[in-house]
């Protein structure tokens, strides 16, 4: 194959994951034969290579005349498909204290159709107060967290309403045994109303 008769394929730059197959190269041309491509350790093919997932791909190419009439030396270039940045939707950022650990919930926004992406949130707290939680990791390698990964959340003190006043017991007579001196009162927390 005459090298002068070959226009080499070129890497497509600026690719970002979108859930669809994207071409990794602008096709090359040859006046004699055809251009063959392979990606990483894949098979040689005539079709311009495509990829769906984020990552770095090594595209190899060569011009082949066919019928054993020669081919150019294989060349290669790298093409990067970058991760898509997700948005984060926070919920449960204001809760009532109940003695259990509280943590906001983070949901990924801006995903390609059919994709899922779970977010691991850290910074859970138990006591009433104001805290910061962080989206620490995601489980889909086609995406990346945004620059801002924290949220402020509040655990409010439970408000109690006295629903029954303790009362002193009257007419107690000594009988040598332990006796209750009052009737127990009762209280209801605001969280029980919800």
Label for each model-derived stretch:
Residues 1-194:
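Solvent-exposed beta-strand/loop surfaces, strongest in extracytoplasmic domains of secreted
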């Amino acid at each position: 194959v005459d090298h002068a008769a070959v226009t080499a394929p070129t890497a497509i730059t600026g690719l970002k994951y979108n859930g669809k197959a994207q071409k990794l190269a602008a096709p090359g041309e040859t006046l004699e034969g055809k251009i063959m491509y392979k990606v990483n350790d894949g098979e040689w093919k005539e079709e311009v290579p495509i990829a769906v997932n984020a990552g770095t791909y090594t595209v190899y190419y060569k011009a082949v005349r066919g019928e054993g009439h020669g081919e150019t030396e294989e060349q290669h270039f790298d093409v990067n498909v970058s991760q898509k940045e997700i948005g984060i939707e926070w919920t449960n950022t204001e809760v009532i204290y109940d003695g259990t650990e509280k943590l906001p919930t983070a949901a990924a926004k801006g995903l390609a159709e059919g994709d899922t992406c779970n977010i691991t949130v850290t910074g859970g707290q138990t006591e009433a107060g104001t805290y910061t939680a962080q989206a620490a990791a995601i489980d889909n390698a086609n995406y990346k967290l945004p620059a801002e990964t924290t949220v402020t959340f509040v655990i409010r003190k439970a408000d109690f309403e006295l629903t029954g006043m303790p009362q002193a017991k009257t007419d107690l007579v000594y009988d040598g045994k332990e006796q209750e001196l009052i009737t127990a009162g009762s209280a209801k927390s605001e969280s029980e109303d919800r």
